[in-house]
């Protein structure tokens, strides 16, 4: 059957690629003629190549279906429907159904491959059986739906539904019954006119056969119900039992094929979605990166689907016994003839409007459907379809009498729907990558996924390709870069098969996950010793602590069978994590510049158990425990302040120890193991459990583990009995001689850089799982860097030498395992000077090379010139330069007493690192056993430096390195040195010219120039001041002159005023006796008016006033001016 499925998939893919002639012209646009791409349900793109979500094609198919319904006379089919004939015992249902299912599913997959949105109307019409019973049902329609003479009745149709629901619940017995049923009926062959509408449980894809296919759309719902009513009026009641028995035999024969078709079409839809994603990525510039992510998801699907069938059958069989008896008794009860006249009346305009509204909503209400389809939340989609199916079901139910409803099991829909819903959910839980991929959106607030570098998808988890990155605070940005790592605990992304990223989303390609599987297979092969209750079935859950989120409702320990793992699929993990990951981060405690500047001193509670032992948990308040577990998984860089006040109502008697993590003023975490060993001796761990004679004390066991096995912070396996014995029946004992023999090679080779050791990786993963599983008491979340406390000294050499750096934000990649400061954003000159001695030992021997661009990887720790792009292509391994001739100590092994013999990389004395030195390995092992740190550095700690005096390696053209030995990129080299005029003696010898002299000369010249500039500016300012002073003095003189002139003018004015007053008095006295007409005698009050009148009289000399004027002249003559 698998070969047939593959063959059908190949045929359908070829059919899907075959399109009408117009698709070749614009292969990236909608193939429907006249369609612009707008209004598509499946996405926002106008460049899809299929008809599956085109509203225009849907409308045309709808019109075609209506035209077929309105035809009054059609050519009758050679054979009648199976239900119309009553389906006798000898009617060959099984063999014919298999052939039809193969052809129909082939046509449906080729025509409407993965058409989930397009057939939403058909789902709503025929969903009652699927929504209630969760079973694929076949609806049969005759060639003449209006006036068919032999039509099936409502009773037989309802009995048929009950039989299908019952047979679906017996999925465990399908494999045996299929072979029997295939042999029972092989006689008649159906005609080509029979049309089957296969109702898929999740896809809802409709299939057509030949030119007589029938598509049921929402607008046709009223006609379909009426057709079913008219066709079923003429059937005799005696055919009910025959139809029921034959349909049960037919359904059992084809059920396995239908289930395979369901899985096949689901896979086809996934492949269609993958094709659409790949088409979009070709438009973008990150095609290779997204293809690698899709390969990860496909590999994860293959891994997860292996374990899913067991879970499905376990859940199916659990509900079979509860539902088998009532469902089987359903078809036996008789049912009177239903009244179908009521059905047409109940099918009112409201229902039709609702169907029309649902059809329009799939086209117009795009945002709602896009959100549902993008997230892939099948639960919401099923609820919507079930809701619509209930509306359609109300049309059929009023005409059915109570006896028939009880026959269908619809009187209590909850009882039938609930277990089948569970079966359906367990069936879809075997594809965790789809749910995880669609439910997790871009962490940028307000981002819908458009414009991303990695594709137009909102389900990525990183901020790397988000165009709205600038909207996010740097704290959240740095937090996501640190948190979103490989889901395998303890994995930094290094060594992955598909990429060296720490933000991948699957376990496929992870070397630690592979080691877990290998260790799990070894664990299964080990013989069980001791009491059978000491089950090792929980080893899988120990290796992956994320499963504790799902394992909240733990049954009693005795209910577990030996060697049987709990049936908890990891498929539901993404939904559980999304449910419990609604946490708030305390960004005030997060410092983006130096991670951990605040005094973080979390209490790390560790239990003295073996790496494989199952800790005793108290699940009395599993909701809080699940919340904290999900938070611990999703948030590894900040401490969760949302702690429940008490996660356990029982006293916690687990042996625990308090480890305070010290952070100095520079934000440096102390990762040494010796200080913690002293601290453990100073603060003994408190334990209320009585230790058996064969169990070491926590201090002694910890001391033993830290000295004999440096790669583990756990105690020896003999301390597994220290857990509480009242929680479990018996303590788990993994102290097997075979296990101890496997761990001996690890303890004897602590300096080996083997990342492929399954036992070492298994032990390390168990340790980090142990640190994450802290349900009881105060639940704290430690920084990801704190996990290096349990690593070996050899692993500390693989971290970034910058204090407080976890490897994120580096230029060469987001790796925490690089050994150089070249791309570290937190490194500065002071840190470079401090780490110069350590970084010089693990460099490429090529001068000026930091390890980037090498064929073997971006590592600075390689020991040969084989993959170095900067190495000379002359074939010389190491060409000694002048510097090496001057100082041959630079080309020797830095380990004191080593002559270069016995090295792993070759018998050369010219290497500069202790990575392959057997003497260094021996001394490092002795130092780790004695508890004292060993430094294999020679007395010459400076190492190869820039030959330019006073240069620390920063600012070079070829990189900011301390270890280059040439003047090629040195910014401090003098002009003569750059042209090669300086010899090696002149450059290197401090006797003739030291760096202080050079720097002093340059500083003196610069100071002299500055002094000259200051003098010039001072002189200019002095000249300006003199000019200003002269201007001020001249202005003061002018002011004095003006004041003197004003005084003179004032004096003149006073003299004139006195003279004027004297003249006015004389005039008054002279004219006192002369009176002008119409005026009083002159005085001081009317002096001005008198003078003006005289002036007018003299200007206008009137003959009448001549005498008066003469007299005035005579009187004024005596006045002297």
Swiss-Prot record:
Zn(2+) 3 binds at residues 486, 491, 504, 510. Zn(2+) 2 binds at residues 442, 447, 460, 466. Residues 1-156, 200-376, 517-540, 668-774 are annotated as: Disordered. It is found in: Nucleus. A zinc finger (CCHHC-type) spans 21-64, 433-476, 477-520, 791-834, 835-878, 884-927, 937-980. Zn(2+) 6 binds at residues 893, 898, 911, 917. Interacts with STEAP3. Binds to the promoter region of genes encoding proteolipid proteins of the central nervous system. May play a role in the development of neurons and oligodendroglia in the CNS. May regulate a critical transition point in oligodendrocyte lineage development by modulating oligodendrocyte progenitor proliferation relative to terminal differentiation and up-regulation of myelin gene transcription. Belongs to the MYT1 family. Contains 7 zinc fingers of the C2HC class arranged in two widely separated clusters. These two domains of DNA binding can function independently and recognize the same DNA sequence. This is Myelin transcription factor 1. It comes from Homo sapiens. The lineage of its organism: Eukaryota, Metazoa, Chordata, Craniata, Vertebrata.
């Amino acid at each position: 059957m698998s070969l047939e499925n593959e063959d059908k998939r190949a045929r359908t893919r070829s059919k899907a690629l075959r399109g009408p002639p117009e698709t070749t012209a614009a292969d990236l646009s909608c193939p429907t003629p006249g369609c612009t791409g707008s209004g598509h349900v499946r996405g926002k793109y106008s460049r899809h190549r299929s008809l599956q979500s085109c509203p225009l094609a849907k409308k045309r198919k709808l019109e075609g279906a209506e035209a077929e319904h309105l035809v009054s006379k059609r050519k009758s089919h050679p054979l009648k429907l199976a239900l119309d004939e009553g389906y006798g015992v000898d009617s060959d249902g099984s063999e014919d159904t298999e052939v039809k299912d193969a052809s129909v599913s082939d046509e449906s997959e080729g025509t409407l491959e993965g058409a989930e949105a397009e057939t939403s109307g058909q789902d709503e019409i025929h969903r009652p059986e699927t929504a209630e019973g969760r079973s694929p049902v076949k609806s049969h329609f005759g060639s003449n739906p209006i006036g068919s003479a032999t039509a099936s009745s409502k009773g037989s149709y309802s009995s048929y539904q009950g039989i299908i629901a019952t047979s679906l619940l017996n999925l465990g017995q399908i494999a045996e019954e299929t072979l029997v049923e295939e042999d029972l009926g092989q006689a008649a062959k159906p005609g080509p006119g029979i049309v089957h509408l296969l109702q898929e449980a999740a896809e809802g894809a409709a299939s057509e056969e030949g030119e007589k296919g029938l598509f049921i759309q929402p607008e046709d719902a009223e006609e379909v119900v009426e057709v079913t009513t008219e066709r079923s009026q003429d059937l005799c009641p005696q055919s009910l039992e025959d139809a029921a028995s034959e349909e049960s035999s037919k359904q059992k024969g084809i059920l396995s094929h239908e289930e395979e078709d369901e899985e096949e079409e689901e896979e086809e839809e996934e492949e269609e979605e993958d094709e659409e994603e790949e088409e979009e990525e070709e438009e973008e510039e990150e095609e290779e990166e997204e293809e690698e992510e899709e390969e990860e998801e496909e590999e994860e699907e293959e891994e997860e689907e292996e374990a899913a069938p067991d879970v499905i059958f376990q859940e199916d069989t659990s509900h079979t016994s509860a539902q088998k008896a009532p469902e089987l008794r359903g078809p036996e009860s008789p049912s009177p003839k239903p009244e179908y006249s009521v059905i047409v009346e109940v099918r009112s305009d409201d229902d039709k409007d609702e169907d029309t509204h649902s059809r329009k909503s799939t086209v117009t209400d795009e945002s709602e459907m896009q959100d549902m389809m993008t997230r892939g939340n099948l639960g919401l989609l099923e609820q919507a379809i079930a809701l619509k199916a209930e509306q359609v079901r109300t049309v059929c139910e009023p005409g059915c009498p109570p006896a028939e409803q009880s026959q269908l099991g619809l009187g209590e829909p909850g009882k039938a729907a609930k277990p089948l819903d569970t079966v359906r959910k367990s069936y879809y839980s075997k594809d965790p990558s789809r749910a995880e991929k669609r439910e997790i959106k871009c962490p940028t607030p307000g981002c819908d996924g458009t414009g991303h570098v990695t594709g137009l998808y909102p389900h990525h988890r990183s901020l790397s390709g988000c165009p709205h990155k600038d909207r996010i605070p740097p704290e959240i940005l740095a937090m996501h870069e640190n948190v979103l790592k490989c889901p395998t605990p303890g994995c930094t992304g290094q060594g992955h098969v598909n990429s060296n990223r720490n933000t991948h989303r699957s376990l496929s390609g992870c070397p630690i996950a592979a080691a877990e599987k290998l260790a799990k297979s070894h664990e299964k092969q080990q013989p069980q010793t001791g009491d059978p209750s000491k089950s090792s079935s929980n080893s899988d859950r120990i290796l992956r602590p994320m499963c504790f989120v799902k394992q909240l409702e733990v049954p009693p320990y005795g209910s577990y069978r030996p060697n049987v793992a709990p049936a908890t699929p990891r498929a539901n993990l993404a939904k559980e994590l999304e449910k419990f990951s609604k946490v708030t981060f305390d960004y005030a405690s997060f410092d983006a510049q130096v991670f951990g500047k605040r005094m973080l001193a979390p209490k790390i509670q560790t239990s003295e158990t073996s790496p494989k032992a199952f800790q005793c948990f108290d699940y009395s308040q599993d909701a809080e425990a699940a919340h904290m577990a999900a938070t611990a998984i999703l948030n590894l860089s900040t401490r969760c302040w949302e702690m429940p006040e008490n996660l356990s109502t029982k006293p916690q008697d687990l042996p625990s120890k308090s480890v305070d993590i010290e952070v100095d003023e520079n934000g440096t975490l102390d990762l040494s193991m010796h200080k913690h060993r002293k601290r453990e001796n100073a603060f003994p761990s408190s334990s209320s459990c009585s230790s058996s004679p064969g169990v070491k004390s926590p201090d002694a066991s910890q001391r033993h583990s830290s000295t004999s096995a440096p790669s583990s912070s756990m105690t020896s396996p003999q301390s597994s009995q220290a857990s509480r014995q009242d929680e479990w029946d018996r303590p788990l004992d993994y102290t097997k001689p075979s296990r101890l023999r496997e761990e001996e090679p690890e303890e004897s080779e602590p300096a080996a850089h083997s990342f492929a050791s399954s036992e070492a990786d298994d032990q390390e993963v168990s340790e980090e799982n142990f640190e994450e599983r802290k349900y009881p008491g105060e639940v704290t979340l430690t920084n990801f860097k704190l996990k290096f406390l349990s690593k070996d000294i050899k692993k500390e050499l693989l971290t970034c030498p910058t204090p407080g750096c976890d490897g994120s934000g580096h230029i060469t990649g987001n790796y925490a395992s690089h050994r150089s400061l070249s791309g570290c954003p937190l490194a500065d000159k002071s840190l470079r000077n401090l780490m110069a001695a350590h970084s010089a030992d693990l460099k490429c021997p090529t001068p000026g090379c930091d390890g980037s661009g090498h064929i073997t990887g971006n590592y600075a720790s390689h020991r040969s010139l084989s993959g170095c792009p900067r190495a000379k292509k002359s074939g010389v391994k190491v060409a000694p330069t002048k510097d090496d001739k001057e100082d041959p100590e630079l080309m020797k092994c830095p380990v004191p007493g080593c002559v270069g013999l016995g090295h792993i990389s070759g018998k050369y004395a010219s290497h500069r690192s202790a990575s392959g030195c057997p003497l260094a390995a021996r001394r490092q092992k002795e130092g780790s056993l004695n508890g004292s740190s060993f430094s294999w550095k020679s007395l010459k700690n400076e190492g190869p430096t820039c030959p330019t005096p006073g240069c620390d390696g920063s600012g070079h053209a070829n990189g900011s390195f301390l270890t280059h030995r040439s003047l090629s990129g040195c910014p401090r080299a003098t002009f003569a040195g750059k042209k090669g005029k300086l010899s090696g003696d002149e450059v290197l010898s401090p006797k003739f010219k030291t760096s202080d002299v050079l720097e002093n000369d340059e500083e003196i010249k610069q100071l002299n120039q500055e002094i000259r500039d200051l003098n010039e500016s001072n002189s200019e300012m002095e000249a300006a001041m003199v000019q200003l002073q002269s201007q001020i003095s001249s202005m003061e003189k002018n002011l004095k002159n003006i004041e003197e002139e004003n005084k003179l003018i004032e004096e003149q004015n006073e003299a004139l005023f006195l003279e004027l007053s004297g003249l006015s008095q004389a005039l008054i006295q002279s004219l006192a006796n002369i009176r002008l007409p119409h005026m009083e005698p002159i005085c001081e009050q009317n002096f001005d008016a008198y003078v003006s009148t005289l002036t007018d009289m003299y200007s206008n000399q009137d003959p009448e006033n001549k005498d008066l004027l003469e007299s005035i002249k005579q009187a004024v003559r005596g006045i002297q001016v």
